[in-house]
Regions:
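Short, Lys/Arg-enriched N-terminal segments with co-localized hydrophobic residues
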Residues: 1-5
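Bulky hydrophobic segments
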Residues: 6-121, 128-131, 135-168
Length: 168
């Protein structure tokens, strides 16, 4: 008789709060570092490992995909494969993406790297890409691997590049 234990979100939040690092880095660790895995995936797929601006959109899509898949895997009793669980995971990934964009946009404006308008419009593009990735992550397997690369490569050409600069 194996006892099924429900995950305790309060224990997880307490663990995140008490560990070193930013809230974002702590959450990333708990989710299996989806951005780090996405960056590795993208570097291997584009430009022979060199980082370029054209990789921003696929990085956002793939990071959101992996975040959604990780959240699906965290749901108890196999709920991550239910319609409700897939939707909750995609919603959660978009909330986390929006929090990241708010932080990144604020930081960029504060440091003088971009105007409020540029930061806002770039965030909108990134959130569009995050949404697409969360949809990809909500369907099919939840392996956090490169099995969905072909799907992402097909949709990426219809998405914004994720970089915005006002014309001077």
């Amino acid at each position: 008789n194996k006892k099924i234990i429900m995950p305790d979100p309060y224990k997880l939040l307490k663990k995140i709060k008490n560990s070193p690092g930013t809230i974002e880095s702590k959450l990333a660790y708990e989710l299996g570092n989806p951005k780090k895995k996405a960056v590795t995936n993208i570097k291997n797929r584009y430009d022979g490992g060199e980082w370029g601006i054209e990789q921003d959109a696929p990085r956002h899509v793939t990071t959101a995909q992996y975040t959604t898949e990780s959240l699906r895997n965290k749901l108890p009793f196999g709920l991550g494969n239910s319609i409700m669980g897939r939707g909750l995971a995609a919603f959660g990934a978009n909330v986390l993406g929006a929090a990241h964009e708010a932080k990144a946009g604020y930081s960029s404006v504060k440091k003088g790297k971009s105007s409020v308008k540029d930061a806002f419009l770039e965030s909108v593009e990134d959130l569009t890409n995050n949404f697409a990735g969360s949809v990809v992550g909500a369907f099919g397997n939840s392996n956090m691997d490169n099995s969905k690369n072909k799907k992402i490569d097909k949709i990426i050409k219809y998405l914004p590049d994720g970089k915005y600069k006002s014309k001077l």
